[in-house]
Amino acid sequence: MAFAKISQVAHYVPEQVVTNHDLAQIMDTNDEWISSRTGIRQRHISRTESTSDLATEVAKKLMAKAGITGKELDFIILATITPDSMMPSTAARVQANIGANKAFAFDLTAACSGFVFALSTAEKFIASGRFQKGLVIGSETLSKAVDWSDRSTAVLFGDGAGGVLLEASEQEHFLAESLNSDGSRSECLTYGHSGLHSPFSDQESADSFLKMDGRTVFDFAIRDVAKSIKQTIDESPIEVTDLDYLLLHQANDRILDKMARKIGVDRAKLPANMMEYGNTSAASIPILLSECVEQGLIPLDGSQTVLLSGFGGGLTWGTLILTI
């Protein structure tokens, strides 16, 4: 049986930084209001770079670290809710940019759970024995999704990309997983309603900005997601004490505080970087993983047992436990 492992990690964010003080100049808010409620102090916002541009930079970093070219890749899976276009896919643009001419490429849409869903999918491709190497990237330009006059959402999000190189391995690294969706609660977090625009339809143009019922999403995270994480750990071959780090979607620092207590782990095992980047949706977990490797917290030598968990629109939530 074939197994998969994460062999390289990388991230990339736009150069421009927008602080809470900057936002206070264009909307009715201030640093204390934002940071005390979310933990966010700044975010990176693209001036000219598209979602595929950010993802391409990550792909180039991953290949450079591994010493490979695009021609050696079998697939590219790109998780995003802010694609350059619906067609062609953002992944196809990345494939062309890096010369990965034999790789199949597609986008995956699962909001802030997107990277976890994409990584789970990629692991199955390699486990089939038919594929050896692939890129899994989360990339977002959420600055184009928010209504910049709405302080309830605009202050939360940022742009960025992160990803991993997944390769075949002789040892098992993916230990447990749980992927979930609940479409009955889909309206509490929405973006990109396109509506019907034909001359034969009776539908008016829809509001396409990102909309969120913050309280409902907060409660969902600390109730449903925390319960799912605990269940995934219970059904895995490890104990909660075996986990070195839990890398959770970076939505809100208060969510992480409550999740740590619910799961029963030390808060220090839940690294956070939303203060620097805000909520980057599908990019948040791989950016955090890349930073943990850069900081020496995760040596990327197979010695650490790490839990990844994303949660967001759909509603969707997913957890992976793996050795890295």
Curated annotation (Swiss-Prot):
SUPFAM superfamilies: Thiolase-like (SSF53901). It catalyses: malonyl-[ACP] + acetyl-CoA + H(+) = 3-oxobutanoyl-[ACP] + CO2 + CoA. Residues 250-254 are annotated as: ACP-binding. Pathway: Lipid metabolism; fatty acid biosynthesis. Keywords: Acyltransferase, Cytoplasm, Fatty acid biosynthesis, Fatty acid metabolism, Lipid biosynthesis, Lipid metabolism, Multifunctional enzyme, Transferase. InterPro entries: ACP_syn_III_C, ACP_syn_III_N, FabH, Thiolase-like. The active site is at C112, H249, N279. GO terms for biological process: fatty acid biosynthetic process. GO terms for cellular component: cytoplasm. The keyword Hydrolase does not apply. Its EC number is 2.3.1.180. CDD domains: KAS_III. Catalyzes the condensation reaction of fatty acid synthesis by the addition to an acyl acceptor of two carbons from malonyl-ACP. Catalyzes the first condensation reaction which initiates fatty acid synthesis and may therefore play a role in governing the total rate of fatty acid production. Possesses both acetoacetyl-ACP synthase and acetyl transacylase activities. Its substrate specificity determines the biosynthesis of branched-chain and/or straight-chain of fatty acids. This is Beta-ketoacyl-[acyl-carrier-protein] synthase III. It comes from Streptococcus pneumoniae (strain P1031).
